[in-house]
Amino acid sequence: MSDKDSKNTPQVPEKLGLSRRGFLGASAVTGAAVAATALGGAVMTRESWAQAVKESKQKIHVGPGELDDYYGFWSGGHQGEVRVLGVPSMRELMRIPVFNVDSATGWGLTNESRHIMGDSAKFLNGDCHHPHISMTDGKYDGKYLFINDKANSRVARIRLDIMKCDKMITVPNVQAIHGLRLQKVPHTKYVFANAEFIIPHPNDGKVFDLQDENSYTMYNAIDAETMEMAFQVIVDGNLDNTDADYTGRFAAATCYNSEKAFDLGGMMRNERDWVVVFDIHAVEAAVKAGDFITLGDSKTPVLDGRKKDGKDSKFTRYVPVPKNPHGCNTSSDGKYFIAAGKLSPTCSMIAIDKLPDLFAGKLADPRDVIVGEPELGLGPLHTTFDGRGNAYTTLFIDSQVVKWNMEEAVRAYKGEKVNYIKQKLDVHYQPGHLHASLCETNEADGKWLVALSKFSKDRFLPVGPLHPENDQLIDISGDEMKLVHDGPTFAEPHDCIMARRDQIKTKKIWDRNDPFFAPTVEMAKKDGINLDTDNKVIRDGNKVRVYMTSMAPAFGVQEFTVKQGDEVTVTITNIDQIEDVSHGFVVVNHGVSMEISPQQTSSITFVADKPGLHWYYCSWFCHALHMEMVGRMMVEPA
């Protein structure tokens, strides 16, 4: 059905003329021709453009039974989860609950998940932005994925062999973990996490003045293996996004609130903010020497990276850049930190090989490390790379992705007349993050790019006032970008990454010795239970522990009796050994639900507060007799 025939398409008042869809549709071919002419290329006809788009669309077709070339990991934003997509098909493969409660798997309900979440299990929400895969020698090693929670100041780790969160930490002394990146070489030793908001220290309600000397935020490093704090560095201003270099020595972060303001006008007052660069080796040496303080009850080493009386600390350098910078991205060739201007139409290119001289005091001006500042368009937010010397930056206000050549931008900064902009592509609409395949590694392959647009407007069937986001897949394998797919997503992915499918190795069934459910195994041992075979009920005062196996289509315990008010823990081990035969356990009217996949042990605790007969059943369709996979909990009145 065409738009003009659809009665479910939002109408545009006549006085406003064409809708944006109509305008862009009418001008697409003309715009492409003008762009090609401006860039010195051949003018594309309507037919040649249509053929090019058709060929690109054929690349994304993944037929029935065929597999995608890449794993894509999307942050779930304020949904609090991570989503796994296949690329280029853009099919959603799995959702990994992290900071949210998930009734399908029982995440946030099961004892195993709550043990991992720790004290923060009390929070039912999260806001995750930046997923990143662990690396060795600048390449994805497929071991872990890390994700931030801005809402409750947490960082979580996901084991990629099982696609489950296995560690979580609340970062002390700070609020709102936003930017998150990983050390790239020699391996991911640290997870670098920006705390965005400035708070008083101690934050005990006695001081609210952000200009106070003891009001600040910190740059945080977490040990990637133990998921414990490694160190924190106090900074001037606030922190937005971050990235690390390919030497293992430097990390950098953008600051958009050098004013330490709390109001919109105040945060835009300065014409320049900065990128703060951290010397990780200097920080490590100070920690090793015991040259640090601690704050409150936390034992985390804290170092002061602020300027004192105009003098730099040995840990940091502040590089002025145009106002309110946002994205901070390391080029895949390892040469540059690139800070996107946001309120400036420029990106600032920091030459990483000049940073040792900056820290050694050999440069007269911190801006001597800036080797390029290309003007790209309105609202530059984030930059990605194709491994062929080109960068791609989102332009939020212009609703475009701009492709530009980095070395030509450096030449232009020196005064040479060169057109470093290669193409501008309309996206729909207002893009934030973007990510090219393997772009944050030294193996960037320049095949696919995803632009994560914040508004979808008229791109999909209307679904009410809340619209989906629009994640658009772009073919960048040739000389020109080609938009090939619109992907609606629920609120609100911020960023994504792509890894080759050979870089991710997953288990087909659980290992019975997996540490994920080790605390539950230990509990069973204390009760003298063999989880692989035993089906028993153990009473310990008003605590009842029900142990059972499950093999489709039957639970090992088909009924058990408790008293009203008992605390009941049900532990189930799925002894099926067939891939994909997952079981579920739901107790009706009790808010109890969990997943038990093959060879997995899961447990859940609840209070049997209602007398009477209560059925439990398998919520997964695991067998032809799935409906008959039930049991009874009989609750005697108190």
From Swiss-Prot:
One of its GO terms (biological process) is denitrification pathway. Cu cation Z3 binds at residues 130, 433. Cu cation Z1 binds at residues 326, 382. It comes from the Bacteria. Residues 542-638 are annotated as: COX2-like. It is found in: Periplasm. It is an enzyme of class 1 (oxidoreductase). Belongs to the NosZ family. In the C-terminal section; belongs to the cytochrome c oxidase subunit 2 family. This is Nitrous-oxide reductase.
